[in-house]
Structure formats: structure tokens, C-alpha cells
Amino acid sequence: YFNLIIMLLIIVGGLGFFVWNDIVTNKGRFKYLRLHSKIVLTFTAFLIISGALIIFLCEIKGTEFQGKSISEKILNSLFQSVTARTAGFNTVNLANLTHASQFLIICLMIVGGSPGSTAGGIKTTTFVVFLLSIISTFKRKKSIECFRRRIDDDVAKRAFTVVAMYLVLSVAATMAVSAIEGVTLNAAMFECVSAIATVGLTLGITPGLSVVSEIILVLLMIFGRVGSLTILFAFSAEHLSPLSRLPQEKIQIG
């Protein structure tokens, strides 16, 4: 029961104040919720269920879950799927998990929780808009649509910016830590993504890191906590809409 309570608290804290206000205002009726709340609730449920299922399947033949009952395996899989996106608790030794499970946890960490919550990461809504933008491109649609609503193009641009900044910093930091410490890319990426997503999970290599690697992780934590758009806007000049625009021309992509 303790693990279930912890998971419930993590989910509550990861949804965001906007969602809870919307739920209370509309008395929990899903069809009356704002698009933001619908995306958060739907994608959060998808991440929790799919994440737990994949971890469970990956660890069937793994060493960490050996000797445990089916119910314990399901609970541990569910717990790690929930906690990977924000809280950073672990009921199993993450270093003993299969590489597939570790990589999945990395993906969950970088997606993170939802805007206005206690969680870090790219955020669920940002990642969904990023995916929907890709899907609309494949379908050759001029607009991004979700739950019978159209998403503004500026929101899509910001989503791509956030995802790009997180990925570039994560990859660069991973390569640096791996080169400095002589550890595998998987271990280095786990630590770096955990830092930038402000999760706190580790495979156990953090205590032995050099000062340089620790500084890299600290900078990632600061970036992840402050937010990519906040930092970007802080160092960018104020942009005024011009009265005239340059001629537009198409270029070949891909």
C-alpha cells in the first residue's frame, strides 16, 4: 500500500495546477475540460501504462525481478514507470535492469511531467505537440489538430525549440561525461538526462564522478529547473513585429 500511496502522490504532483483547477471547475467531466487538460490526462495515462508494460516485458528474463511474484513484478514495473518522470524514487536496483528498461526510463525522464507541476523534463504537452506536428507533416495537413481543436503554429515552434534544446544538451553532456569518466554512453546518458530532467535517478556512478562531470550535471540541473524557454527569452532581444516582411521562398528538406 505504501508504494501505491507514493505513486498516487507522484501522479497528483505531476499533473499540474492548471489541470487540477480545470478538473475541479468542470467537476471532472472530461468532455468539458480544456485541450491542455485533455492532453495531459490522456498522455500521462498512456505513459504510465505503456511504460509499466514495457518494463515488465523487458525484465521477465532479467536478474532484478527474479524470485518475485507476478504481483510484485507488476507493482515494481508500475512504480518505476511513474517515478521515472518526476520523483526519482526507486524500489529496485536500476543498475541491474536490462539496457532496454534503462533506455525506456531515460525516455520517460526526458519527457517528464506536465506544465505547472513539480516535475521537470520536456513536459507532456510539449512532447505531444512535437509528435502531432510530425504526424501532421506526414499527413500533409496545414494545421495541427487534437481533440477537435487546432493548435497554434507558434506553440509548435516553441515545442520544437524545447525538444531540440533538451536533446542537444543531453547528447553533448553525455559525450562529455562519457569521455571524461570512461563510462559507457548508456550510463553517462542516464545520469545526464536524470540531471536535466531534475529526476534524481542514478545507476550508481555519480559518487565517483570527477569535479568537471559534477559541474556539467549541476549546470544541467539548473537548466532543467529554470526551463529552456525562460533561459532562451532571457538572453534574446525583444522582437518587434516588422511593418514589412522579406520575400518568401521554398527550400528542399530531407
What are these regions (language model features)?
Residues 1-254:
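Membrane-proximal intracellular helices of multi-pass ion channels
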